[in-house]
From Swiss-Prot:
It comes from the Bacteria. InterPro entries: N/Namide_PRibTrfase, NAPRTase_N, Nic_PRibTrfase, Nic_PRibTrfase-Fam, Nicotinate_pribotase-like_C. The modification Phosphohistidine is found at H231. Its EC number is 6.3.4.21. Belongs to the NAPRTase family. GO terms for biological process: NAD biosynthetic process via the salvage pathway. Catalyzes the synthesis of beta-nicotinate D-ribonucleotide from nicotinate and 5-phospho-D-ribose 1-phosphate at the expense of ATP. This is Nicotinate phosphoribosyltransferase. The keyword Ligase applies. It catalyses: nicotinate + 5-phospho-alpha-D-ribose 1-diphosphate + ATP + H2O = nicotinate beta-D-ribonucleotide + ADP + phosphate + diphosphate. GO terms for molecular function: nicotinate phosphoribosyltransferase activity. The keyword Ligase applies. Pathway: Cofactor biosynthesis; NAD(+) biosynthesis; nicotinate D-ribonucleotide from nicotinate: step 1/1. It comes from Vibrio vulnificus (strain CMCP6).
Length: 437
């Protein structure tokens, strides 16, 4: 019997995913209909997920049963008018083919430990939706296996304490520029936990909650679906056009794809300095704002505001969105720092969707969310990279490609570090020890 925070089938709706995946799906369908990609699961935390391999495979294979039904398509047409009739017709016929597109197995790390491996291969627009679905599946299976004893009351208590703190601090500090969207789908404790959390938020702080990145829950709770674009859009262009032009082309193509709607630019695929070099007057004018996802939010925001001012653009007409590992305390510090200097908004995920406070099990181990990502590794057979403004978030399988990318964008290339990284990558080369059934 599943506890109240879990359900037998994890993904029960094709809309139980992040808004930006469908946005990028349309853009890939329009501009790059034959582009082939590969995604890889990267587990950053110390969790050994190899024991979950069969359950993960089973849940992913269940995705083949999902369909976009007429009511869901009508909802998308209403809430996302930038999605074209042609694309919605495509969604009507869309099917997942996980047995052909997703490989689930186990590999051995350089340290000799076993770890879960999930690889996604296929045409970009046919495989792009797997990312958030796979991550939601893995997180819930892990928590159902090892943390099923956590009661729903613990989630309520943690949320209520956080909202009490938020209410107190907003009043004490007289902060009036705090608004946020819920963005916890990929790393949620479980679907039921995310749903419970959103129900609490809309009851306690409806005036602060802008919406959610989850289409299914937005529809169920009549909230605004929120989302624009992710790193993979810029990463893919590293293989689709001349590498030195990739970021500019990605920015231009995004505007073209939605006629200027969804105009929030993500700045850290190559790094903030490289981004600003490409974010010229035309682009800075056309885009409604920018999103921070790594590095110091204060240094980043100062650079963005200075850049707008250097172009003769009033930064108070633009929106700065912060989405990097936020809690309420950090968000309020950002609000105070940028008050009156720009419009501010936040996307908050794990802090709301996967925090059980100081809950410990009978062995004295405190609950911690799993840290993982599913990121594009190749596009049309060529490597792609995310450099980031935070070294721990950098991702690339090919050190030579990464060095070339940095050089093309005028970033420092540390040869000694590159050599050591190459040696480390060789030591960490994955050895598959269990093939896909």
């Amino acid at each position: 019997m599943c506890a109240p925070l879990f359900q037998p089938a994890i993904i029960q709706s094709v809309l139980d995913l992040d808004v930006y995946k469908i946005n990028m799906m349309q853009a890939a369908y329009r501009f790059y209909p034959q582009t082939q990609v590969r995604y890889e699961l990267i587990v950053r935390s110390d969790d050994n997920l190899s024991d979950l391999v069969e359950e993960v495979r089973e849940e992913i294979n269940r995705l083949a049963e999902l369909r976009f039904d007429a009511a869901q398509l009508a909802y998308l047409a209403e809430k996302a008018p930038y999605l074209t009739a042609e694309f919605l017709s495509y969604l009507e016929t869309f099917r997942f083919h996980p047995q052909q597109q997703v490989s689930v197995g186990i590999f051995r790390t350089a340290q000799g430990d076993c770890q879960l491996r999930v690889t996604i291969n296929g045409i970009w627009h046919e495989t792009i939706l797997y990312e958030t679905l796979v991550m939601s599946i893995i997180s819930e299976l892990r928590n159902r296996r090892y943390w099923a004893q956590i009661p729903q009351s613990q989630l309520h208590k943690v949320l209520e304490d956080k909202l009490d703190f938020l209410d107190s601090e907003l009043k004490r500090r007289n902060i009036t520029n705090f608004r946020f969207s819920e963005m916890g789908t990929r790393r949620r404790f479980s679907f039921a936990a995310q749903k419970t959390m959103l129900d609490v938020l809309r009851a306690r702080v409806p005036e602060l909650l802008l919406g959610t990145s989850n289409y299914h829950l937005a529809q169920e709770f009549n909230l605004t679906p929120i989302g624009t674009v992710a790193h993979e859009w810029t990463m893919a262009h590293q293989a689709l056009v001349a590498i030195q032009h990739s970021q500019r082309v990605a920015l231009d193509k995004w505007l073209e794809a939605f006629n200027g709607s969804l105009g929030i630019a993500l700045t850290d695929t190559i790094g903030i300095d490289a981004f600003l070099s490409d974010f010229d007057l035309d682009k800075a004018t056309a885009y409604a704002g920018v999103r921070h996802d790594s590095g110091s939010p204060f240094v980043w925001g100062d650079k963005i505001i200075a850049h707008y001012e250097s172009l003769g653009i009033d930064p108070t007409t633009k929106t700065l969105i912060f989405t990097d590992g936020l809690d309420f305390a950090r968000a309020l510090d950002i609000c105070e720092y940028f008050a009156g200097r720009a419009q501010i908004s936040f996307g908050i995920g794990t802090f709301l969707a996967n925090d059980m406070g100081n809950w410990t099990n009978d062995k004295g181990t405190r609950y911690q969310p799993i840290s993982m990502v599913v990121k594009m590794a190749e596009c049309n057979g060529s490597p792609v990279a995310k450099i980031s403004d935070e070294p721990e978030k950098a991702m690339c399988e090919d050190i030579f490609f990464l060095m070339n990318l940095k050089q093309r964008f005028g970033l420092e290339v540390d040869l000694d570090k590159a050599i050591e990284t190459l040696k480390q990558m060789k030591r960490q080369q994955k050895k598959r020890i269990q093939s896909v059934a």
